[in-house]
């Protein structure tokens, strides 16, 4: 395949297999960037060649790249490549949104990579406030670019999570308890993405606004709290640990039996343990990261207990993996070494992690390199699993073999190097070496930091050999005979539900490898361009807020132009009204090419759309919960005892305008609901008329809010953290009202063109009810002050 063909496929494709391969390539590029920053860290701690600013920049980028832009894209890449093949789906549920999700991540990686060129990013991957919001140490725009990059990454991950949940629940051709274990692993990961990412997005929005606009969400002097950032971040951060490791566990569960040539031992227990891990990780485990920040014994006990409990399902997996190996005929190949090393390193990570639920020990170790060592044991284990999968599926992807002897050499060097690095860090931490220091504070730690640096060199050599083995395999590898490279059929093990017709299953190929993939009739690469241009929204507002208004407006208009052209060209231009559309109150009697879906399929699509909208609403509930919960946090003397008194409670008039507008908005759910009921009975005409009434009431509400903000509100967001939350939360709700109106307008225009919006009717109605329900909470909190 030549370069021109590769670029064309990359820009136009919506095929999950192709998108998955692009995720993997992006993850490998990010791995190189993250590794360069790791080398800078080791150089500073070994030879003191950097200044403090450059060192902390490297620490920040290394952590952010490895977590957000290496492990997550690689896991998502394997999910795109494998899940449809494993469950018999022809693609993901939303192929176009899948492509959009990938292309949103590309500018995120670019912005994060160039961020130190535009200002200091001395944050750490956890970006704690107030360091992340002040502009003296972290001067320039670098930190803003990091925040924008991670907002884009979070939105991409949320869309991906909903897409995979819908794909697995609606398109699988195998029963749940027959699904491959990797599918189970990523299914639970997708649910955690939906739950965890919105709180990080909320925190990043607060930090973005505080840096650029002076809204004091985290400023104690004005009623804010730096601990609020920790709550929001770690509510995301600990589920994120399992977002990282559950796909790796799934790959190990999937591939270990192939290498042991026997069925997995304890399939049901492993599948259910994934659910248990996901459930426990979202309960209260995140607060064990904050034992030194929370002075509440009950909270510490609950968090400690749930943290200990999560070891049980993890132990179930390890026992079953070990039993699988015990009864198998193990093939000592490159993937085998990496998969077994995963188990060993995961155990070491678990053993070092056992100390942290014990509050007194956590107090002693929390600020030391022992935490860094523990985390590296876990992340290195994840890396082994991902590389093991890469080597296992390489013959399927390329149709060629690699040099397995060299592969095993590289794998052994990688494992030895990573073990030395993580162990050196852990010993230094046990001896008390503090983390986040640019200079080693005592010579007692030198041998162990040197040990970590030697390990890093071995790790680099191992990765270099493994990369060379794969590159050599692509160009000079021996061809695979048949379509079962690992001879799994002979032991009745199955790699895919969609069996390959021929190899390779490479870029631009169909799921079975039989033919080159088409582009779904796309004449312009809308989803790649839209994904790239989405970054223009936060970038545009950034330029506006720093005073470069023309640049900001140009960026915003560029995105709007592409979006409007896409909507017209893809959704309205090709549509021709059918000759007979309505009869007897709006029942459709004939269909055009654009409306060829049968009523039975239309009803089925409505059921699917309801599930999809409810998953989106779950993410939205977490987002609004982060905003409203953040307000409750800074206003409470229990959670913000030192600075809650510095808040100025927004004095907002309830009568007459806000009360009237609230009544209008809440009443708009009535015509919306009746419209939906008419639609289900086939009366599209009444659906249209009542939908227009709903829109009119929504527009009236927005108009009333604009008038309220310009005539009734006499305070500004910068007055206090409370006023910042008022403006941020009410504006967020207003944005969602606009989104709801856009969906309704879209439905009305499609109906006018003669299209029956089966799925769209569900999306418009359910989402509008959600927007109205959220306003009840917002109005009660900020206008009636019933919650705080």
From Swiss-Prot:
For the keyword Iron, the answer is yes
Example GO CC term: the record gives: plasma membrane
Q: Name one Pfam family in it.
A: COX3
Report membrane topology: Multi-pass membrane protein
Keywords on record: Cell membrane, Copper, Electron transport, Heme, Iron, Membrane, Metal-binding, Oxidoreductase, Respiratory chain, Transmembrane, Transmembrane helix, Transport
Residues recorded as binding Cu cation, renumbered to this chain, are 238, 242, 288-289
Q: Where in the cell is it found?
A: Cell membrane
Q: CDD domains from the xrefs?
A: Heme_Cu_Oxidase_I, Heme_Cu_Oxidase_III_like
Q: GO annotations under biological process? A: electron transport coupled proton transport; oxidative phosphorylation; respiratory electron transport chain
Q: Which PANTHER family match?
A: CYTOCHROME C OXIDASE SUBUNIT 1 (PTHR10422:SF18)
Q: Which family does it belong to?
A: In the N-terminal section; belongs to the heme-copper respiratory oxidase family.
What is the protein name given in its UniProt record?
Answer: Quinol oxidase subunit 1/3
């Amino acid at each position: 395949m030549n370069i021109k063909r590769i670029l064309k496929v990359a820009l136009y494709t919506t095929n999950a297999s192709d998108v998955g391969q692009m995720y993997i390539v992006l993850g490998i590029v990010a791995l190189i960037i993250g590794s360069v920053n790791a080398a800078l860290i080791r150089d500073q701690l070994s030879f003191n060649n950097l200044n403090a600013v450059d060192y902390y920049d490297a620490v920040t980028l290394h952590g952010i790249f490895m977590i957000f832009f290496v492990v997550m894209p690689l896991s998502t890449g394997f999910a795109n490549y494998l899940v449809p093949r494993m469950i018999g789906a022809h693609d993901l549920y939303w192929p176009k949104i899948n492509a959009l999700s990938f292309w949103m991540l590309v500018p995120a990686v670019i912005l994060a990579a160039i961020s130190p060129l535009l200002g200091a990013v001395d944050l750490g991957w956890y970006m704690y406030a107030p360091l992340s919001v002040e502009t003296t140490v972290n001067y320039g725009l670098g930190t803003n670019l990091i925040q924008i990059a991670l907002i884009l990454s979070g939105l991409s991950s949320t869309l991906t999570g909903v897409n995979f949940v819908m794909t697995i629940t609606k398109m699988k051709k195998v029963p749940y308890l027959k699904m491959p274990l990797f599918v189970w692993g990523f299914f639970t990961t997708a649910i955690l993405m939906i739950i965890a990412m919105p709180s990080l997005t909320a925190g990043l929005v607060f930090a973005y606004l505080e840096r650029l606009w002076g809204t004091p969400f985290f400023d104690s002097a004005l009623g804010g709290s730096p601990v609020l950032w920790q709550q929001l971040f770690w509510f995301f951060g600990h589920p994120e640990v399992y977002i990282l490791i559950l796909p790796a566990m799934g790959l190990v569960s999937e591939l270990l039996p192939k290498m042991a040539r026997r069925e997995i031992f304890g399939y049901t227990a492993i599948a259910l343990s994934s659910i248990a891990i996901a459930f426990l990780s979202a309960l209260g485990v995140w607060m064990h990261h904050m034992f030194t920040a929370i002075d509440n014994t009950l909270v510490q006990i609950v968090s400690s207990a749930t943290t200990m409990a999560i070891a049980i399902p993890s132990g179930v997996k390890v026992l079953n993996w070990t039993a699988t190996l015990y009864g198998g005929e193990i093939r000592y190949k490159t993937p085998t070494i990496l998969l077994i090393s995963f188990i060993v390193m995961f155990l070491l990570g678990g053993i070092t992690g056992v100390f942290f639920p014990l509050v007194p020990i956590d107090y002693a170790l929390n600020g030391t390199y022992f935490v860094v060592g523990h985390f590296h044991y876990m992340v290195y284990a994840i890396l082994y699993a991902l590389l093991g999968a890469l080597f296992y599926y390489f013959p399927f992807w390329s149709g060629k073999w690699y040099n397995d002897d060299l592969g095993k050499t590289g794998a052994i060097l990688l494992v030895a190097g990573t073990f030395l690095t993580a162990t050196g860090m852990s010993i230094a931490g046990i001896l008390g070496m503090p983390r986040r220091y640019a200079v080693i504070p005592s010579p007692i730690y030198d041998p162990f930091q040197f040990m970590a640096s030697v390990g890093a060199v071995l790790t680099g050599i191992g990765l270099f050999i493994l990369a060379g083995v794969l590159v050599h395999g692509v160009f000079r590898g021996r061809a695979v005979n048949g379509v079962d490279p690992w001879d799994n059929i002979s032991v009745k093990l199955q790699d895919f539900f969609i069996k390959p017709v021929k190899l390779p299953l490479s870029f631009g190929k169909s799921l079975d490898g039989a033919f080159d993939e088409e582009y779904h009739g796309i004449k312009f690469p809308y989803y790649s361009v839209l994904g790239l241009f989405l970054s223009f929204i936060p970038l545009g507002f950034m330029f506006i807020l720093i005073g470069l208004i023309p640049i900001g407006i140009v960026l915003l208009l560029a995105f709007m132009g592409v979006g409007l052209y896409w909507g017209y060209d893809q959704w309205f231009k090709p549509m021709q009204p059918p000759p007979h559309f309505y009869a007897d109150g709006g029942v459709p009697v004939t269909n055009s090419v654009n409306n060829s879906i049968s009523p039975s399929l239309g009803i089925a699509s409505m059921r699917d759309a309801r599930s999809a909208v409810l998953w989106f609403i779950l993410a939205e509930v977490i987002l609004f919960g982060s905003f409203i919960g953040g307000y409750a946090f800074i206003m409470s003397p229990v959670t913000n005892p030192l600075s809650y008194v510095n808040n100025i409670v927004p004095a907002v008039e309830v009568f007459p305008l806000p009360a009237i507008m609230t009544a209008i908005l809440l009443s708009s759910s009535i015509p919306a609901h009746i419209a939906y009921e008419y639609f289900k009975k086939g009366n599209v005409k009444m659906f249209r008329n009542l939908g227009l009434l709903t829109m009119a009431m929504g527009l009236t509400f927005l108009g009333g809010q604009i008038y309220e903000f310009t005539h009734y509100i006499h305070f500004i967001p910068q007055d206090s953290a409370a006023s910042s939350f008022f403006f941020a939360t009410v504006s967020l709700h207003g944005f969602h009202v606009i989104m709801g109106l856009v969906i309704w307008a879209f439905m009305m225009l499609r109906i006018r063109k003669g299209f029956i919006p089966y799925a769209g009717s569900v999306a418009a109605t359910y989402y509008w009810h959600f927007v109205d329900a959220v306003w009840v909470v917002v109005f009660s909190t900020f206008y009636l002050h019933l919650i705080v």
